Amino acid sequence: MVPAARVTAIDESLGESAVLLALAATARHALAAPGARPPELIVGHGVLGRLLARVALAEGAFAPTVWERNAARARSDGLYSVVAPDDDPRRDYRAVYDVSGDAAILDGLLDRLAPGGEIVLAGFYPGELSFDFPKAFMREARIRIAAEWKDSDMKAVLAHIDAGRLSLDGLVTHRHDAADAAQAYRRAFEDTDCLKMILDWRHAA
């Protein structure tokens, strides 16, 4: 049993895509801070990066640029541009959202930031983050951390889905029976083609 406040009613038609709702709400939470600018650059084209871009578009933002080093993950179905960082000459981004999980990335992002711009750390970073203070000082850079979604974020995501503004299609890429969990975990962490893995417990004893 869980408190009713921790349960969300969803449409059965969402099917397995419903497992992405919390992550979509996390993306929306990063975008919804007071005074937040919509992303001009998103770093990382995994599931969270894709959801950030999709939710931003659902909320009326212009299409962002997305950085992705792995060419196999570069497809965006024409919704926005996905490029390798080295192929992007721009150095005046006003809002950069990082979901790469790279703890050493801040200095490189500061090089691409416009004066007064903001870097939003929306991923998870296993180690300490540091940056070159003079570089940030000269740009009067702002650094913001986005954490766990709130009820208002989930409601907004569900409203976007109901209105047809947001799709979760194409993000669950792999499925395994729960009995094959060891193989599934290896694939989820080692196969760059795996965006989201689902374990199917329907046949578990």
Which positions does each model-derived feature cover?
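Hydrophobic/small residue at the entry helix of a nucleotide-binding pocket
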Residues: T26, L48, A56
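Residues in the short beta-alpha loop(s) of Rossmann-like NAD(P)-binding domains
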Residues: G46, R69-N70, Y125, W149
